[in-house]
Amino acid sequence: MARLCAFLVMLIVMSYWSICSLGCDLPHTYNLRNKRALKVLAQMRRLPFLSCLKDRQDFGFPLEKVDNQQIQKAQAIPVLRDLTQQTLNLFTSKASSAAWNATLLDSFCNDLHQQLNDLQTCLMQQVGVQEPPLTQEDALLAVRKYFHRITVYLREKKHSPCAWEVVRAEVWRALSSSVNLLPRLSEEKE
């Protein structure tokens, strides 16, 4: 009987260890994929940014709001996922495909899609984790409003090449800033 109990305990420990080893290594994978996506996004530049200064606009990226909210891991992952999804939606639109080099656009969108898969895997592992809904909802709403402002801007500018260049630079800034949420993920993992 003692051997059976020891064997069962060992199985439980091993299965728990294997589940944890399959766990969410998001800071590392997200950072690598994000760097690759940013590199491709930089390569997508078609116009000198200085030639589009008259089209510049402050879209009010909600990073300040996100930073001030002391977002925990359970909240950071949905915010990163929404930021990535909204970026993917923007760059997979019909108007976007006309504005960019198809090879670079496909590469960028593939990187975003891989990031979404990583984020979704981590979200699935958080099932049952209680998260403060108000803070998370505020951050998600801020991200959605930010992308709505970008979409309205593109529509008002009739998806001009300069408008897309301004948006490309803005999205580059947003994705670059998103890595600021990663230390929170690393801290909670330890």
Swiss-Prot record:
Positions annotated with a glycan in the UniProt record: N101
Superkingdom of the source species: Eukaryota
Keyword Signal set for record: yes
First-listed, main subcellular location of the protein, grouped into a coarse class: secreted
GO cellular component, one term: extracellular space
SS bonds (residue pairs): C24-C122, C52-C162
InterPro entries cross-referenced by the UniProt entry: 4_helix_cytokine-like_core, Interferon_alpha/beta/delta
Pfam families named in the record: Interferon
Function: Produced by macrophages, IFN-alpha have antiviral activities.
Full protein name: Interferon alpha-2
Source species: Mus musculus
